[in-house]
């Protein structure tokens, strides 16, 4: 299968279940998170995929997700390229704080703006636009060339870094991206035409 990109949000992390803003903090996966990544690898193998190259962020929850997938596919020796350009959005002063407590302090409306608006960043953090400003150039210069050479590429990363990438890939506007949600451990498969436009999009559910 040529010109293929698989995106996957890391499996459930320890801070996901604690309801904490994570950002660039580095908690590991929960038992469920490990299982989600293993299942994703099995499903990708069953779909007949084989990766030529794999990318992930500088954070262990994404790295371990990628490792589980490659192990299940019999490709544990494939180089895994790690780069902070694919890191989760930096939540700044909110990082490590409980989401419910932040809502109580700042108000539901303000927190929703920080979490889901395109251009508004939390204090000392990144907006989705800021996140896209590092994700998209990295994709264009380092990842897309492999896809255009008819290779199959894995990116294991994070909810907001992947949302920023999807926004650019699909040409979504700042309103459309607000409703885009990525479930932990669920692969999203794109195939591309030779001119880099999207040919197909498939979600592999457990």
UniProtKB/Swiss-Prot annotation:
It catalyses: (2R)-2-phosphoglycerate = (2R)-3-phosphoglycerate. InterPro entries: His_Pase_superF_clade-1, His_PPase_superfam, PG/BPGM_mutase_AS, Phosphogly_mut1. GO terms for molecular function: phosphoglycerate mutase activity. GO terms for biological process: gluconeogenesis; glycolytic process. The active site is at residues 10, 88. Substrate binds at residues 9-16, 22-23, 61, 88-91, 99, 115-116, 159-160. Pathway: Carbohydrate degradation; glycolysis; pyruvate from D-glyceraldehyde 3-phosphate: step 3/5. SUPFAM superfamilies: Phosphoglycerate mutase-like (SSF53254). The record marks 158 as: Transition state stabilizer. Keywords: Gluconeogenesis, Glycolysis, Isomerase. The keyword Nucleotide-binding does not apply. Gene3D superfamilies: Phosphoglycerate mutase-like. Its EC number is 5.4.2.11. Belongs to the phosphoglycerate mutase family. BPG-dependent PGAM subfamily. Catalyzes the interconversion of 2-phosphoglycerate and 3-phosphoglycerate. PANTHER family: PHOSPHOGLYCERATE MUTASE. Homodimer. This is 2,3-bisphosphoglycerate-dependent phosphoglycerate mutase. It comes from Bartonella quintana (strain Toulouse) (Rochalimaea quintana). The lineage of its organism: Bacteria, Pseudomonadati, Pseudomonadota, Alphaproteobacteria, Hyphomicrobiales. The gene is gpmA.
